[in-house]
């Protein structure tokens, strides 16, 4: 399908304008004066900015394109995104404020930093850092795929898609290197305003354009495609998969390096409590986006590629101006999360791999420069990986969720369980990762989400083995444990 020049020009103008704002956000040299300033903004962000930043971080182009694609191809299974985010925000209310207080006092910028201090274990820190970096690469690639798909629909016949994608991500790498977290934080304001305005406009107008009203669209779904509105009771993605995927994804959400980067920018713990209450409002958009997938199923020709369901639906529904606004929204929902993900991955590598194992005596100024420079390496690796293995991205990201949730017991349990031991935690993490990869490799999930098997094995190993090492742990203390457990 031929692109639309007007839509392409509007998309390009908005994206380049936002990138420019990203550079302007870092004009003050203090934004890159230290790792803490560059990666978490000196922990000075208030409730609204954290809400917008975490929203920009978690609700990506993959969220919107992936949800409509899943709804288009598999129906109501796409609704699993709703309970999983609610689980994530509900649980986070109880542990993120405590984690933030520890990170603030001890100047921690990654979960691996916390694990090292809590358990006095560089090895556990290394494990968490490696898992965090490796799992983020395909996630960054999915953002690349999001903007590539957007440009394919908007710009076919006018531009070289791959060249423009590479240029776009290099620009993001540059403004991230220059501005740190302040770049995506301030550009997230624009992105989130566009998401709310454009997505709400789409979900209101598309049913009217094609069916006359929302009620008529629902009637047509019920009459012509009732299977879209039900979840299978059995099979590889039935109700057991839906429930376990929601639980695992919810627990994993704030284990991602980019998610916790947004969390650590908060100026106090109360900001995080407020965000746990108000972030679920984003689910209003998600629910409606799923119905756009249903609309695409009814409107687009049979045999259409589910991957392009939302983009093609926009293309057949509107003229160039609205297309451009919609495409730019999706493009920004790719680029801004990519920036935050690159910060998270760079931070893990520089602090928990380079500083702890390669150059322990590195000076703070050099460490800051290495952390910032790693942005180019991370985004470069993501670009290469995405071009070499384009069909593996979604499955690897889903595996990434199952991998990241294995960190949950090491981080969250240890905030409340004083006698949790280093040895049992490490063994549990390794067992969880091993079981997850074994289930994923064999494909024998028995209708359960892969990560659930791994997390179950992880927790069982931790609980069973912890008593073997607990005697030494009872007599042990360190500054983080003193803060957590001394009344």
Range-by-range predicted roles:
Residues 1-487:
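Membrane-embedded helix-loop-helix hairpins and adjacent transmembrane boundary segments
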């Amino acid at each position: 399908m031929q692109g639309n020049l007007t839509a392409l020009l509007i998309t390009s103008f908005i994206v380049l304008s936002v990138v420019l704002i990203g550079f302007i956000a870092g004009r003050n040299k203090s934004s890159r004066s230290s790792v803490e300033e560059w990666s978490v903004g000196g922990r000075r962000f208030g409730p609204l900015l954290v809400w917008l930043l975490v929203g920009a971080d978690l609700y990506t182009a993959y969220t919107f394109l992936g949800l409509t694609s899943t709804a288009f191809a598999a129906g109501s299974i796409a609704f699993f995104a709703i309970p999983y985010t609610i689980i994530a925000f509900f649980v986070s209310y109880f542990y993120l404020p405590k984690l933030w207080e520890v990170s603030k006092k001890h100047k921690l910028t990654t979960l691996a930093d916390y694990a090292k201090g809590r358990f006095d274990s560089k090895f556990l820190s290394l494990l968490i850092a490696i898992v965090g970096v490796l799992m983020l690469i395909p996630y960054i690639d999915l953002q690349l795929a999001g903007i590539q798909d957007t440009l394919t629909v908007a710009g076919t016949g006018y531009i070289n898609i791959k060249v423009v994608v590479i240029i776009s991500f290099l620009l993001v790498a540059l403004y991230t290197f220059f501005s740190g977290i302040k770049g995506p934080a301030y550009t997230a304001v624009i992105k989130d305003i566009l998401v709310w305005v454009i997505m709400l406009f789409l979900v209101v107008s598309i049913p009217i354009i094609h069916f006359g009203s929302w009620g008529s669209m629902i009637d047509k779904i019920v009459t012509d495609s009732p299977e879209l509105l039900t979840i299978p009771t059995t099979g590889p993605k039935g109700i057991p998969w839906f429930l376990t995927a929601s639980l695992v994804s919810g627990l994993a959400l704030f284990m991602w390096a980019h998610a916790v980067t947004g969390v650590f920018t908060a100026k106090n713990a109360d900001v995080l409590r407020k965000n746990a209450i108000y972030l679920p409002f984003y689910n209003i958009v998600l629910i409606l986006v799923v119905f756009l997938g249903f609309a695409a199923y009814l409107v687009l020709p049979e045999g259409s590629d589910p991957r392009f369901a939302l983009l093609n639906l926009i293309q057949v529904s509107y003229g160039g101006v609205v297309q451009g606004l919609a495409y730019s929204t999706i493009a920004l929902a790719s680029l801004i999360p990519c920036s935050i993900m690159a910060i998270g991955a760079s931070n893990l590598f520089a602090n928990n791999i380079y500083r702890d194992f390669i150059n322990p005596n590195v000076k703070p100024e050099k460490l800051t420069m290495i952390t910032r420079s790693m942005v180019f390496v991370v985004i470069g690796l993501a670009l290469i990986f995405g071009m070499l293995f384009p069909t593996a991205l979604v499955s690897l990201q889903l595996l990434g969720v199952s991998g990241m949730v294995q960190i949950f017991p090491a981080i969250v349990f240890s905030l409340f369980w004083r006698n949790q031991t280093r040895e049992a935690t490490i063994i549990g993490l390794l067992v969880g990762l091993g079981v997850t990869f074994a289930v994923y490799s064999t494909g024998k999930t028995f209708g359960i989400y892969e990560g659930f098997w791994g997390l179950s094995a992880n927790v069982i190993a931790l609980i069973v083995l912890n008593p073997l090492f607990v005697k030494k742990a009872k007599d042990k203390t360190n500054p983080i444990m003193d803060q957590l457990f001394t009344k």
